């Protein structure tokens, strides 16, 4: 590949040049696996958005007590196998989580906003994006909402759409487990 973004066949004939500058694709090189592949530009930035809500009949204090215990995440979230807190700086918690998908490790930054929200940002690993859990008190109940803006990193990016339904069903199951625990 030369500096103008053209890929030249191994045997240069002067004619066999593909010009990708105006195509909606990117030439990607994976040095670990010695692969050259083409990726549609729309796949590179496509995030899966998942929104799940549930109503909880409980006090805000009790709901916050359960969801803010982030070390207990594997108890409710079946996609999270293990969590390990690495450091705490102010209201930011850095931790390593092991997810159920091929026991992959991801680095997260968690920010707790007491009795309002938990924001988890995936900063390294197979997942990129955020998971935000919000508590909104109403007169009779509390609305708990989880919003994912997520995609798979690297070459796995093309499978983001495939795993969206899997993450959504896991989130629905987790929300029901959390609701059951809070309402006990």
Predicted regions and their residues:
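Hydrophobic ligand-binding cavity/cleft-lining segments
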Residues: 39-90
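Hydrophobic/aromatic beta-strand elements that line small-molecule binding cavities or substrate pockets
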Residues: 54, 106-111, 130-137
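Glycine-rich portal/gate segments that line the openings of hydrophobic small-molecule binding cavities
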Residues: 74, 84-127, 143, 173-184
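Beta-strand/loop substructures that line and gate deep hydrophobic ligand-binding cavities in soluble
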Residues: 123-173
């Amino acid at each position: 590949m030369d500096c103008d973004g053209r890929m030249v066949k191994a045997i240069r004939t002067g004619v066999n040049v593909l010009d990708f500058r105006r195509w909606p694709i990117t030439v990607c090189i994976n040095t670990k696996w010695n692969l050259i592949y083409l990726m549609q530009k729309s796949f590179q930035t496509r995030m899966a958005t998942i929104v799940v809500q549930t109503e909880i009949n409980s006090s805000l204090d009790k709901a916050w007590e359960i969801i803010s215990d982030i070390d207990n995440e594997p108890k409710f979230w079946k996609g999270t196998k293990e969590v390990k807190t690495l450091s705490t700086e102010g209201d930011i918690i850095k931790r390593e989580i092991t997810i159920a998908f091929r026991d992959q490790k991801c680095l997260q930054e968690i920010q707790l906003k007491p009795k309002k929200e938990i924001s988890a940002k995936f900063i390294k690993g197979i997942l990129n994006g955020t998971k935000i859990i919000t508590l909104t008190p109403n007169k009779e109940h509390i609305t708990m909402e989880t919003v994912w803006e997520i995609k798979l990193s690297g070459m796995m990016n093309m499978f983001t759409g495939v795993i969206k339904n899997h993450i959504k069903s896991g989130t629905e199951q987790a929300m029901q487990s959390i609701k059951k625990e809070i309402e006990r």
